Amino acid sequence: MNNTEFYDRLGVSKDASQDEIKKAYRKMSKKYHPDINKEPGAEQKYKDVQEAYETLSDAQKRSAYDQYGAAGAQGGFGGGGFGGFDGGGFGGFEDIFSSFFGGGGGMRNPNAPRQGDDLQYRVNLTFEEAIFGVEKDVSYHREATCHTCAGSGAKPGTSPVTCGRCHGSGVINVDTQTPLGMMRRQVTCDVCHGSGKEIKEPCQTCHGTGHEKETHKVSVKIPAGVETGQQIRLQGQGEAGFNGGPYGDLFVVLNVLPSQKFERNGSTIYYNLNISFVQAALGDTVDIPTVHGDVEMAIPAGTQTGKVFRLKGKGAPKLRGAGQGDQHVTVNIVTPTKLNEKQKEALRAFAEASGQEISTPKKKGFFDKMKDALEDI
């Protein structure tokens, strides 16, 4: 067996995170569960998935598997000659390897309540919704407790029974001959598939899983002043738990759409204002749009391009403090590209009054243009 087979069984890459491995396991486990999939070979594939997950979900087992393959994950790597060694107070090499590779009292009780998986849902907000806050209804698919069997997986009127093979532990002991001698390891029970229970008569709605798909709707209150990437946690709105465990949580990830007028950094809002050179030279009073409505702003005479004015309290709310941010207005002086004769005369008079000499560029004739063209060749 190569060192990627377990990853291939779950359909994940070798550098997959534990969350990705867990999700892949749940998907493959449901796909090949013997109570659901009656196709030939499904049960063996289910066992293969269980074996792969048992190793890859444990950090120490996974590390050993990545280095030595399946033998490493089972404790069967290294030199020989120690088969009959008794380590006194350590309980022997079998117990030492058992503590590292899945044996003994470290096994999780399969019948213990477990919380369901968390979910993520991405919500788009307009620029203004992020500033002022909003309440949104979101709808998504999730695994819910089966309404027919109340999560037991058994047909109404019946109950799951303790597994006769593993006696409810969910695991069985398997002896394996290794270079270190006979090693005992614990593996998932091949009868109850780790649940510790047998369902003689599965529920017809959920086919024994205890869960069913549903479309769930919930209202999300989004506070004022949020930004892209922030999350809101809704407790108990994730997927159904196991063995009576609580639902997981829903994490709402916020994405603020850009504005055509404004930019934002934290509680500060930025706005670019275009003005004429006449307004810049003589000064003016203009209306400035803000998210709170238009406000008047005075432009002093002699204002230069790049000058920044601050409108106090016209920014976004501060999430972790009182009050509002500010709006910064950056001035950009626009030079006209077309002037009529009257405007040109006025500017020439201004230049003359300022002691400036303005040379009017000569228009090039036909021969000048030909000369320039030949020089470029």
Swiss-Prot record:
Q: Where does Zn(2+) 1 bind?
A: 146, 149, 203, 206
Would the keyword DNA damage turn up in this protein's UniProt record? Answer: no
ZnF (CR-type) residues: 133-215
CC per GO annotation:
cytoplasm
What are the names of the required cofactors? Answer: Zn(2+)
Keywords attached to this entry: Chaperone, Cytoplasm, DNA replication, Metal-binding, Repeat, Stress response, Zinc, Zinc-finger
Per the entry, the cofactor note is:
Binds 2 Zn(2+) ions per monomer.
What is a GO molecular function of this protein?
zinc ion binding
Q: Any keyword Methyltransferase? A: no
- Please state where this protein is localized: Cytoplasm
Task: Indicate the segments forming the J domain, all copies.
Answer: 5-69
Q: Which domain of life is it from?
A: Bacteria
Any Gene Ontology biological process: protein refolding
Q: Which windows of the sequence hold CXXCXGXG motif repeats?
A: 146-153, 163-170, 189-196, 203-210
- Quick one: where is this thing mainly located? cytoplasm
Which residues does the annotation say bind Zn(2+) 2? 163, 166, 189, 192
Domain description: The J domain is necessary and sufficient to stimulate DnaK ATPase activity. Zinc center 1 plays an important role in the autonomous, DnaK-independent chaperone activity of DnaJ. Zinc center 2 is essential for interaction with DnaK and for DnaJ activity.
The Swiss-Prot or TrEMBL record describes its family as follows: Belongs to the DnaJ family.
The record, for NCBIfam families, names:
DnaJ_bact, PRK10767.1, PRK14276.1
PANTHER family associated with the record: CHAPERONE PROTEIN DNAJ (PTHR43096:SF48), DNAJ HOMOLOG 1, MITOCHONDRIAL-RELATED (PTHR43096)
- Tell me, what does this protein do in biology? Participates actively in the response to hyperosmotic and heat shock by preventing the aggregation of stress-denatured proteins and by disaggregating proteins, also in an autonomous, DnaK-independent fashion. Unfolded proteins bind initially to DnaJ; upon interaction with the DnaJ-bound protein, DnaK hydrolyzes its bound ATP, resulting in the formation of a stable complex. GrpE releases ADP from DnaK; ATP binding to DnaK triggers the release of the substrate protein, thus completing the reaction cycle.
Assembly notes: Homodimer.
Q: What is this protein called?
A: Chaperone protein DnaJ
Say which species the protein is native to.
Answer: Streptococcus uberis (strain ATCC BAA-854 / 0140J)
Supply the gene name: dnaJ
